[in-house]
């Protein structure tokens, strides 16, 4: 399930037919899909707006990060977080010698979980929605993947890095070596020309993760 903006319709990915469907709310999601499984509570993976997540690529090594502990990792986000750092949930992804830290306000997590719970659903995974975009083939700042629709604008620059975009010209200034932008079709366009745009969206990798 993809929540593109805080109050936007939900987008639901159908793996069997490789297509998105829009629903207005969690309750409508339950009404439509409630009979798909017999268990009382349905499990969903929620892709939330990337604007809610903070990211830090730490230069500390594994031992130093372990010594910091959870509270120490929270304070790595002190300069960028509007939420008190004690109220941040932290996740760490390590690739080779690189350590990527992600922070999300606990209040956001609880709000999404509560919305799903009221509709009889259970969120089992939370992921920033830039991960729906395919990974650029050139990840040294030379190529980025861009997605835009009426609800959001997203950018992915590498396997573990991406963001919500508010003003595109400023973003381009951050990538002085940029040579290629891969633009994905909006999922809203699928409903205008499903035979063409849906095929492009599937082949380009949106929601293939």
Residue ranges and their predicted role:
Residues 1-209:
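Hydrophobic/aromatic-enriched cytosolic interaction surfaces used to assemble or bind macromolecules
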């Amino acid at each position: 399930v993809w929540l593109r903006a805080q109050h936007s319709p939900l987008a639901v990915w159908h793996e069997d037919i490789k297509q998105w469907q829009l629903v207005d709310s969690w309750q409508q999601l339950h009404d439509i899909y409630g009979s798909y499984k017999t268990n009382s509570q349905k499990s969903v993976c929620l892709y939330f707006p990337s604007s809610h997540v903070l990211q830090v690529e730490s230069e500390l090594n594994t031992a130093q990060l372990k010594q910091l502990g959870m509270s120490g990792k929270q304070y790595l986000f002190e300069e960028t977080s509007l939420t008190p750092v004690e109220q941040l949930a932290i996740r760490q992804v390590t690739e080779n010698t690189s350590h990527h830290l992600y922070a999300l306000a606990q209040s956001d997590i609880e709000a999404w979980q509560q919305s799903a719970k009221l509709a009889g659903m259970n969120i089992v995974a939370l992921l920033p929605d830039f991960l729906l975009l395919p990974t650029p083939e050139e990840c040294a700042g030379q190529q980025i993947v861009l997605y835009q629709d009426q609800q959001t604008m997203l950018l992915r620059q590498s396997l573990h890095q991406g963001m919500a975009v508010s003003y595109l010209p400023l973003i381009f200034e951050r990538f002085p070596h940029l040579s290629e932008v891969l633009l994905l079709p909006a999922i809203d366009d699928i409903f205008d020309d499903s035979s063409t745009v849906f095929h492009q969206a599937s082949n380009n990798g949106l929601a293939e993760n």
